Design a protein with these regions (language model features):
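Nucleotide-sugar-dependent
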Residues: 193-207, 225, 229-230
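Structural alpha-helical scaffold elements that stabilize or flank donor/cofactor-binding regions
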Residues: 55-57, 95-96, 181-182
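Acidic donor-binding loop of glycosyltransferase active sites
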Residues: 184-200, 218
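N-terminal pre-catalytic "stem/leader" segment of glycosyltransferase-like enzymes
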Residues: 1-67, 218-228, 234-251, 262, ...
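Conserved active-site histidine-acidic residue motif and adjacent donor-binding/catalytic loop
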Residues: 170-185, 196
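Short alpha-helical segment that forms part of, or immediately flanks, the ligand-binding pocket
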Residues: 180, 208-215, 229-230
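A short, well-ordered alpha-helix in the C-terminal region of glycosyltransferases
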Residues: 259-276
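Catalytic core of nucleotide-activated saccharide and alditol-phosphate transferases
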Residues: 67-160, 300-301
Length: 336
């Protein structure tokens, strides 16, 4: 199996995406030779991309890229290398060449790239939920937890103030080392990122906090945008937030707090996202990537880029087709 290099702009990043990538790197190291490489600027104790390119055989390594805004430049920079794009958020607007396989971090992203890169090799690999996110079955002294970062104005400026007059509400406004401990103290977790992602024209890449909260026993109220729809099922394992009116949300949240019950001991809502399950998928994917790059080296007859009109503007054709279809259908009814 080829050596694998996970590319990072830098290593000192406090974000969920960076943490998810680090967890995946650790998992890959159980399967194949894998290490982190930085490409922004040199950092002590870490390989730098330009040095790695000079020291490695082009065919005996795989470079995994993921930082959305840097992807087009990195693909050009690694033109003669085996490159894989690990895609979380979508909507950046770039095309991925058919020579670059795509690993989608959610089923929402999988569907996006299956439409916009129909000739590419595509896999699905969910982000990892750490074992620390589990229900400890302890008394809960916080009614509601909210993470300020990426939250909608409605959540922070209307809903939270209305709830604070009746319930104990913790608003997390900085990086937390032990988020699982907080989730294990809370009955309800509120999450609404639809406004945040919409303003940038991007999608929620994986949205792990609601699933982490569920794994710790919280009742979740959330937006269901993008990758959140992978695992959130309103009315069955969560409640949709920002529904109809402020008063409706308040009523639903109040009912959840007063009716909160300890979840089943046997059920783990994050079972498919645990390290063991993700590792099994990763083993299959890495084997498939190795085979793909072996074949690519021997077979230069790749599909030509798909017509952009076909990929990105299918609705225009439908609009032209529908009126004619119904006109002919009505004529046939009259004739009958």
């Amino acid at each position: 199996m080829r050596d694998i290099y996970f590319l990072f702009p830098q290593m000192n990043i406090e974000s969920g995406g960076h943490l998810a990538q680090m967890k995946l790197l650790e998992l890959a190291q159980r399967i194949a030779p894998a290490q982190a490489v930085v490409y922004g600027s040199r950092e002590e104790g870490l390989p730098f991309l330009e040095d790695v390119l000079q020291q490695t055989d082009a065919d005996k390594s795989i470079f995994i890229i993921h930082w959305g805004f840097h992807v087009p430049d990195l693909i050009d920079r690694l033109a003669d290398r085996n490159v894989v794009y690990l895609s979380y958020s979508t909507g950046y607007g770039f095309q991925i060449p058919v020579r670059v396989p795509i690993i989608a971090g959610s089923r929402h992203t999988l569907a996006y790239w299956s439409r916009h890169a129909p000739d590419s090799l595509i896999y699905y690999l969910p982000a990892i939920i750490s074992e620390e996110f589990m229900n400890l079955h302890r008394p809960r002294d916080i009614d509601i937890v909210v993470q300020k970062r990426k939250s909608s104005r409605y959540l922070l400026e209307e809903l939270v103030p209305a709830l604070q007059s009746q319930y104990s509400v913790m608003v997390i406004d900085s990086w937390v080392e032990d988020l699982a401990a907080i989730f294990n103290r809370a009955r309800v977790f509120l999450y609404d990122t639809s406004e945040y992602w919409a303003q940038y024209g991007l999608s929620e890449g994986f949205g792990l906090p609601p699933l982490e909260a569920m794994a710790c026993g919280c009742t979740v109220f959330s937006s269901i945008n993008d990758a959140l729809s992978d695992y959130l099922d309103p009315g069955f394992n969560c409640h949709k937030l920002h529904t109809y009116s402020l008063q409706y949300d308040l009523k639903q949240i109040s009912s959840a707090i007063h009716g909160w019950q300890e979840p089943s001991l046997e059920h783990d809502p994050a079972a498919d996202y645990r390290s063991e399950a993700v590792q099994r998928r990763l083993e299959v994917i890495l084997t498939g990537l190795d085979d793909f790059f072996d074949h690519q080296r021997l077979d230069p007859s790749a599909f030509q880029p798909v017509n952009k009109t076909f990929v990105s503007k299918p609705a225009s054709g439908i609009r032209r087709w529908i009126p004619g279809f119904f006109k002919n259908w009505i004529k046939s009814l009259r004739a009958g």
